[in-house]
């Protein structure tokens, strides 16, 4: 999957209780104990067929669950939370997909339609496919400001704090509480521009089976599997 088109619905979870469902404007804000029930409801309402020759993803929810999402399953370990700029959940519902198969060098345009009025929706789907085809053939380039760091990266944890985590992890392993632990130390820096060009360079110089670029109103995320 290399591209998706036209958001139908945006689902955002901003805190332990607040859940927002909006389509270009806020439709509703409500409280949830765990977001997964509402997300599962949306998925059940937007099922699509798996067709031979099509990619595994032909439409649905795209986005991220932040690290802090774990608190909905284990609220007892929430403490000293720091705002890292991410919502707990940001998911966008898409019914149109522009899929580029890098291996086959093949472009696939996909439009999902509802079955409530099949003939009417089919004609609408054909029109939307023609519109996607027109957009691609126009070759309109979007200027993207390259990423520029305004300062050096700084770690969230000091060397002493990180070493303490390592020692604590070793103790937990010795005591039999855990058998493996993956520690990390997030780096941060002020920057301007977009991650998109950085993602394109990464995709060219270090192609990986798992790569991603995601952008919403206030967040950009890009990455690749290390192997």
Where are these regions (language model features)?
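Extended alpha-helical targeting/anchoring segments
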Residues: 1-227
């Amino acid at each position: 999957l290399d591209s998706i088109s036209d958001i139908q619905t945006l689902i955002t979870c901003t805190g332990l209780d607040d859940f927002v469902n909006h389509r270009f404007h806020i439709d509703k804000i409500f409280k949830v104990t765990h977001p997964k029930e509402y997300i599962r409801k949306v998925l059940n309402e937007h099922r699509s067929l798996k067709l031979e020759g099509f990619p595994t993803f032909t439409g649905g929810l795209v986005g991220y669950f932040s690290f802090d999402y774990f608190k909905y399953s284990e609220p007892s370990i929430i403490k000293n939370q720091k705002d890292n700029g991410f919502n707990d959940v940001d998911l966008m519902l898409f019914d149109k997909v522009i899929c580029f198969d890098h291996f086959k060098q093949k472009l696939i345009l996909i439009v999902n339609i509802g079955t409530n009025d099949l003939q009417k929706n089919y004609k609408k789907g054909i029109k939307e496919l023609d519109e996607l085809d027109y957009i691609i053939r126009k070759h309109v380039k979007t200027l993207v400001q390259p990423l520029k760091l305004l300062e050096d990266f700084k770690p969230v944890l000091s060397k002493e704090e990180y070493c303490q985590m390592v020692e604590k992890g070793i103790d937990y392993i010795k005591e039999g509480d855990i058998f493996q632990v993956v520690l990390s130390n997030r780096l941060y820096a002020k920057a301007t521009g977009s991650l998109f060009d950085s993602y394109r360079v990464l995709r060219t110089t270090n192609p990986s089976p798992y790569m991603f670029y995601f952008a919403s109103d206030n967040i950009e995320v890009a990455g690749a599997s290390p192997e």
